[in-house]
Curated annotation (Swiss-Prot):
Domain of life: Archaea
Organismal lineage: Archaea, Thermoproteota, Thermoprotei, Thermofilales, Thermofilaceae
Entry protein name: Riboflavin kinase
Primary enzyme class: transferase
A GO term, aspect molecular function: riboflavin kinase activity
Keywords: Flavoprotein, FMN, Kinase, Magnesium, Metal-binding, Nucleotide-binding, Transferase
Enzyme Commission (EC) number: 2.7.1.161
Gene: ribK
Length: 227
């Protein structure tokens, strides 16, 4: 496999210059400049690619033509698929944690009509009046902090309550919440002012998550957030 990735840049450059379609003459000087190769290194890579069956050299008099074989095309496709899979998976952030008892803060927010209306506007549904709390594994606490920097959530600003107190703002991240082989569409909350540390993530959904996901304290939960 290491040899595959050594010859891949050369193979890709040949493909870009038409060698996937038909045998082509190539400017060695241009390829050396593009790939930053020495003549000796270029010679070794061509030999390696030919030995592995990725390219063929066809000599006509003093002219040399190169063509990428079906085996070479398969290598290009394999690397492309690896890159696409890696890039596509990077459009989601997965946070892992374990169910812990809550402090009742979520129920307070869910009981304030203005918050409920804001959640309905952002999420398209009225959340169950309460949150599920999970304690993130250590490495995912840092991912949560990185999530804030991406600014991909929906912002609900704080406002003044009837009794004169100020409510705090909250950022809402749409999410898929998964546990015990069940997936529920919900959201993760990042509340501006909370008694919890960054290791505690509060989740909401249109249903009671403990019931829908058959959860008890200590159960593992995964939260997948588009970024």
């Amino acid at each position: 496999m290491s040899k595959d990735y050594e010859v891949f840049p050369l193979l890709l450059e040949m493909a870009k210059r038409g060698c996937l379609v038909a045998p082509r003459r190539l400017s060695r000087i241009e390829i050396l400049k593009t790939l930053g190769l020495t003549p000796w290194r270029f010679k070794k890579l061509v030999e390696a690619a030919e030995e592995e069956g990725y390219i063929e050299r066809r000599v006509h008099g003093r002219m040399v033509f190169y063509v990428v074989t079906e085996r070479g095309r398969a290598l290009l496709r394999r690397v492309y698929d690896d890159l696409k899979r890696t890039i596509d998976s990077s459009t989601f952030l997965t946070l892992r944690g374990y169910v812990v008892p809550g402090l009742g803060e979520g129920a307070i927010y869910m009981g304030i009509p203005r918050y409920v209306e804001a959640f309905k506007e952002v999420l398209g549904y009225e959340p169950y009046p309460g949150t599920l709390n999970i304690k993130l594994v250590d490495e995912d606490v840092y991912l949560r902090r990185a999530l804030r920097e991406k600014r991909v959530g929906f912002r609900i600003e704080g406002f003044r309550l009837d009794e004169g107190r100020e409510s705090c703002g909250v950022t809402v991240y749409k999410a898929m919440i998964m546990a015990n082989g069940v997936t529920v569409s919900g959201a993760a909350l990042d509340i501006d002012k909370t008694k919890h540390g960054d290791e505690i993530l509060e989740l909401i959904a249109p249903v009671r998550l403990r019931d829908e996901l058959r959860l008890k304290d200590g159960d593992k939960v995964e939260v997948v957030i588009p970024v």
